[in-house]
């Protein structure tokens, strides 16, 4: 087939000006001013240009990759405390993407391995937020998977390949981009073995899922249906290489501190045994810092799975001071978010310091960490947010400790008038 200008066809045999093939040897011959180029040469030129562009992009991304100190500094803007975890994550992520930038260099005999990460910490301590912030900072595709929904292939539930499908959806099914992404698998502690003893029944949502995740996390070519379709034999699959995807697994691992304490303290029975009170015991965060791979195996993770997660980072339980900082200091702090909502109604929102302390105390009592702060503030501000759009004359709302405790309503300050506050209704 030949393309010529103005439909002209001289009737004589035409040849590609670059490779010399005739019009009968190629699928398409494109005409220019006194020259011709075939489809094969066009493809070759495209490949050359694509390689040069990719090399340039790799070099520029290598220059743009922030140092571990810079990564940790950016994490500080969004996540309060957890300095040790930030340092571990910053170094691991920096080394991971440095490894990706070096992988295509020729003549380098040393092959760098991948270091996936395991985050251990109480609920609401910032595990998911750390992973989300890292992905946003590095501008790479990011997805969160819930380990509790995963089952072995062939059983009711999600296959592990669905994790890669979610990652592809985040980057419009661009396989190259997906292969540089970050996957955060939450609630990883929930797929621990149900028992140390072998059972005649198959553990399809525990050890079975760990086995299924092994190759995916270590690095394999996963077959994923295009555009979220269901698998069937006649379908063409997208092939995604997971060797360069960074997997971050996180979980609360409730009870792991007891496993660690049993290992690290001398046990004894009888009259000579040392009696230790609860007060003498360490805090959960302090115990978790001493975690070793054997402790995770005793908890219920299989040794092969623990081996695929060489980087361990533990997060501390948040105290009252840290929760107060979370309410006010980060870029997207909750008090700033609610102040923005009220600002849209031309109303100033003020939280007194005693109110912030009361919110932090309530969150500690509920044992929900930073995650519980929003639900407390939502409950406190519900009535006010309901009324404010209808009261155009309100200029400021003040929240103090009594409002958080439920003994009074927020103080509303009206334009050109005295402040008004309603007593809380009797329970």
Swiss-Prot record:
Gene Ontology CC: HslUV protease complex
SMART domains reported for this sequence: AAA, ClpB_D2-small, zf-C4_ClpX
Binding sites annotated in the UniProt record for ATP: 122-129
Domain of life: Bacteria
UniProt entry keywords in alphabetical sequence: ATP-binding, Chaperone, Metal-binding, Nucleotide-binding, Zinc
Domain ClpX-type ZB, chain residue ranges per copy: 4-57
Biological process terms in GO annotation: cell division; proteolysis involved in protein catabolic process
Residues annotated to bind Zn(2+): 16, 19, 38, 41
Entry's Gene Ontology molecular function annotations: ATP binding; ATP hydrolysis activity; ATP-dependent protein folding chaperone; protein dimerization activity; unfolded protein binding; zinc ion binding
One Pfam family, short name: AAA_2
InterPro entries membership: AAA+_ATPase, ATP-dep_Clp_protease_ClpX, ATPase_AAA_core, Clp_ATPase_C, Clp_protease_ATP-bd_su_ClpX, ClpX_bact, P-loop_NTPase, Znf_CppX_C4
Task of the protein: ATP-dependent specificity component of the Clp protease. It directs the protease to specific substrates. Can perform chaperone functions in the absence of ClpP.
Family note: Belongs to the ClpX chaperone family.
Record note on quaternary structure: Component of the ClpX-ClpP complex. Forms a hexameric ring that, in the presence of ATP, binds to fourteen ClpP subunits assembled into a disk-like structure with a central cavity, resembling the structure of eukaryotic proteasomes.
Name of the protein this chain belongs to: ATP-dependent Clp protease ATP-binding subunit ClpX
Native organism taxonomy: Bacteria, Pseudomonadati, Pseudomonadota, Gammaproteobacteria, Pseudomonadales
Name of encoding gene: clpX
